Structure formats: C-alpha cells, structure tokens
C-alpha cells in the first residue's frame, strides 16, 4: 500500500541521515588524527598529546 511504501521510504531516508552523520563524525576523527600526525612529524609533541587524549 501507499502508506507502507511511505514508511519504508521514511525509514530509508532516516537511515541515510544517520549514516551521513556517522561518516561525518568519523571524518572529523580522521582529521584530528591526521593533524596530530602532522604535528608529530614537525616535532611538536604537545599538540599530538592534546589531540590524542580524548
């Protein structure tokens, strides 16, 4: 029925929103790690310690 199709579409849409948010959060964490590694290679160890201690 149309109502069931609407529910499935709404559920799929919500699933994509959640996935998008999760991927966004993972991206932020990856960037923090990348920044920490850059700082480490420069030799600024304090920035690495601050970024790694969540």
Swiss-Prot record:
The keyword Membrane applies. This is Hemolytic toxin. It comes from Heteractis magnifica. Pore-forming protein that forms cations-selective hydrophilic pores of around 1 nm and causes cytolysis. Pore formation is a multi-step process that involves specific recognition of membrane sphingomyelin (but neither cholesterol nor phosphatidylcholine) using aromatic rich region and adjacent phosphocholine (POC) binding site, firm binding to the membrane (mainly driven by hydrophobic interactions) accompanied by the transfer of the N-terminal region to the lipid-water interface and finally pore formation after oligomerization of monomers. Keywords: Cytolysis, Ion transport, Membrane, Nematocyst, Secreted, Target cell membrane, Target membrane, Toxin, Transmembrane, Transport. Residues 11-30 are annotated as: N-terminal region. Pfam families: Anemone_cytotox. Octamer or nonamer in membranes. Monomer in the soluble state. The lineage of its organism: Eukaryota, Metazoa, Cnidaria, Anthozoa, Hexacorallia. GO terms for biological process: cytolysis in another organism; monoatomic cation transport; pore complex assembly. GO terms for molecular function: channel activity; toxin activity.
């Amino acid at each position: 029925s149309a109502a069931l199709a609407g529910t499935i579409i709404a559920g799929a849409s919500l699933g994509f929103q959640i996935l998008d948010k999760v991927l966004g959060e993972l991206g932020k964490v990856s960037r923090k790690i990348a920044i920490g590694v850059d700082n480490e290679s420069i030799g600024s160890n304090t920035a690495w310690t601050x970024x790694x201690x969540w």
